[in-house]
Amino acid sequence: MVELDHVVEEVLKVINDNGFSQKGAFNLRQNGTSICHGDSEHIKIKKKTDKPGIDIYIDGDTKGEKVYIPVVVSVSGMTDLVYNDFYIADGADVTIVAGCGIHNSGCNESRHDGVHTFHVGKNANVCYQEKHYGEGNGTGGRVLNPVTNIYVGENSVFNLDTAQIKGVDSTVRETLVEMDKNSRLYVTERLMTEGDQTAESNIEVRLNGEDSSAQIISRSVGKGNSVQTFHPKAVGNNKCQAHIQCDSIIMDHAEIGSIPEIRARDLNAAIIHEAAIGRINDEQLLKLRTLGLTEEEAESVIIENFLN
Amino acid sequence: MEDNGAKKCLLDHISFQVDDGEMLVITGPNGGGKSTLAKVLIGIEKAESGKIFLNGEDITDYDINHRANAGIGYAFQQPPRFKGMTVQRLLALAAGREMSDQECCKLLSDVGLCAEEYLNRQIDGTLSGGEMKRIEIATVLAKEHTLCIFDEPEAGIDLWSFSMLIHKFEEIHKEKKQSLIVISHQEKIISMADRIMVIDDGKIKAEGLKEDVLPCLNGLDKCHTCAGKAGVRA
């Protein structure tokens, strides 16, 4: 077992809710290098030979197993680019816990660009959890630009749960999902920005297969002078259903934009988009204050639950 | 008080007392000032003059959360919705501590909800007005208070749940000996009161023991018999 330094351990505690341990299938990447990895009976991880990154093979007998692939960047001035490809066999049932934390105590920009591609077979059930986080008292920026490509096979279910809660100065998130017959997609995106942080999220879902369905829920909170832009897009290429819901709480001098796009190329495509941006509701604050919470506590509870 | 930016006298010379374990029902026409009075008591609205005491302590300058922590529970007439917050989380916040599934289920059952179905439900637009109202009442029941204020608890609740609610008020009133102020138009609730206060046009029109005020409620202006006993201020 590889001994981890204090910074890495603390970052892992934040980005992996249930804790990271060097057991089962896992791969921990720190500052551009895989520092430890393990396979399980049904999940094998192989290092790429042509570019940085790993290939993760999840066989069809995988049932309810978790694989951890966290990334930590703790050197100021580093740009880490990684390509991770997931091959999920027919019938597999797996949870993939990713996440990236940047600890920057220096004056140079630290950046992680993760390109993740999922090849999901038929009748599979995949849950992908990704938490992004930044910390450190340096003046250098903390930048995360994830690219996620997902190909969901027939009758498969894909849950994409992403959260960027704190400390990331700039992010541009690109997500593309291609859906086959009768597949289902659930996307939950949670984002909070503060200070002068900027965040942009572009999600495109192509519902190609008959009876495919997608639900995209995006919740965000913008504080300080931060700027957020959302561009969710659902394209119905067949008989399908899609529902996009974007809710944002705006605070201080923040700026939030939501630019939806829904496009149908089939008479039986049903696609809905809802978007709302607004300040914290006064009635909510009052209710929580009548329970004994201060205004600050009430505000924090509202944000925490809204993003939960 | 300020009402839509203009100075208006919404409550005038309101003075009353609720004794330990007493149930006071405030009734009267819509727009008469009942809910405003309740909001003044919890601190949501501020009165320009006057004093409010709780157990002898002057709480006039306390803000909302201090009044809540001092022992006032308050149920909104139209409770707000919270996207992302579960029913169980709200009840825990109301109780001021973590609550087990069993404790939450008991509270929800007390207000007529099939408990287990609701614990992880979000308090959002998927809940009906009646469900919201019952959860709101459960938030007040989650903690022991010196004084509980309910603003039209019957509104939006079906008859079956209403009977359970009445039973719960009786329990708070008679067994727990908590003081209660209930704003209501509902005959069954009014008849549970120890004392009744009628507010109209921002003023107390009548106040007294239930048996003295109740007979006058249907014709307050014409009532002469109870004037002496109930202190009718026509």
Q: How should each PLM-predicted stretch be described?
A:
Chain A
Residues 1-46:
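Short, Gly/Pro- and small/polar-rich lid/capping loops
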Residues 26-28, 35-286, 290-293, 303-308:
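Conserved beta-strand/loop scaffold segments within soluble protein domains that form the structured core
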